[in-house]
Amino acid sequence: MPSISRRSDELGTENAFVVLAEVNDLLRKGKDIISFCIGQPDFHTPKNIQEAAIRAIRDGKHGYTPSAGIVELREAAAIYLSRSRGIAVEPDDIVVAAGAKPFIMYSILATTDFGLGDEVIYPNPGFPIYESQIRAMGAIPVPIHLRESRNFSFDPNELEQKITPKTRLLILNSPQNPTGGIIPKRDMEAIADILRRNPHVWVFADEIYSQLCYDGEFVSLTQFAGMLERTIICDGGSKTWAMTGWRLGFAANKALAPVFTRWVTNTESCASQISQWAAVEALNGPQDDARGMRDTFLARRDLIVKLSNEVPGVTCKTPGGAFYTWPNITEACKMIGANDSEEFRKRLLNEAGVAVLADIHFGPRVPDEGQHIRFSYAASNEAIENGIARMADFIRKNKRKAA
């Protein structure tokens, strides 16, 4: 049989979907499962956005668009990024794709060369596709550790130590998946200072959760002197407007926009025209629903953090953004005799019917950081209350058995 490429062997997956398959299998068997696995809003896309898509269908907007995206969307995205970040972005700086995720690959392809030892620094724990794409594109992944003591940010001094002449790209994600951490302004300023001393490094700023900040204003690296020109801003419709299935994202960088356009031409041709017109309405239309979703997430965050900290053996920091918590379950693992977070996760699913993700689903476990699991609180208050109660009961019951 013909062989499969080594590049394909390097390609990983999103473990959230692996766990979701486990959950669906249990559901088919009639099990009662409360799931906190998937990182997508549990709201419908706002009606005005739905109506814009319906109009596009009825108006016959069914064909290809320019690979960079329709002008109306690039204009709307440029205005949105300029206003929300306090920077100057032009429509020609914008490229649209079928979701924000393709720009991870396009950015690595545009800034590194295959097999030459080019390095990409990325956050760990982090979105698993970062490391997967770095390896598959023939670059070397260099993790920078997020620490609980820093509210799940990294030490800028560690960044400076990790940059080498081979470093080509730095991936930043704030607010962050999986921890909900935010890079504070003082650290972002320190990162900018470090990058000024290392002009050979590009930056991929994954800002898909930019509108889901709860403690203070969102800070983008592009707001600091000299950073806009070398930063790829990546955003989209999925998280802010509950458009995960519409597959619509966009990136901005003046120098790389023509390169990204060629990659889109060679891979996707273009994003769905219907989704693009829906995104125009998302950016230009009323924002009441988006603000309402954000307020709901904030209330849920406060609820799940409070309840988690009442569970035996669990401590949970308050995340600054996104819709994830990253509770420390080190003591809980000891209490029930679980070797690590993955064993805890599996037992929690099979014995208590609560589905979460383990820290190892987001990269190698950070040394000396203990055991963690991820909750997505894109779930109802009732689900949060019942799910955390089940986890508490699970720990108490198994603690008694261990004793």
Label every model-predicted segment.
Residues 1-63, 354:
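N-terminal "arm"/small-domain region of PLP-dependent enzymes with the aminotransferase-like
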Residues 19, 36, 53, 77, ...:
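Generic structural signal for small/hydrophobic residues in well-ordered secondary structure
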Residues 57-63, 74-119:
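Phosphate-binding glycine-rich loop
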Residues 110-134:
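Conserved PLP-anchoring active-site segment centered on the Schiff-base-forming lysine
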Residues 142, 146-215:
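Active-site phosphate-binding strand-loop segment of PLP-dependent enzymes
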Residues 161, 337-338, 347-356, 362-403:
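PLP-dependent enzyme catalytic core of the Aspartate aminotransferase-like
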Residues 224-298, 302-311, 394-395:
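Conserved core segment of the aminotransferase class I/II
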Residues 280, 296-305, 316-332, 371:
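Conserved glycine-rich beta-strand-loop-beta hairpin in the small C-terminal domain of fold type I
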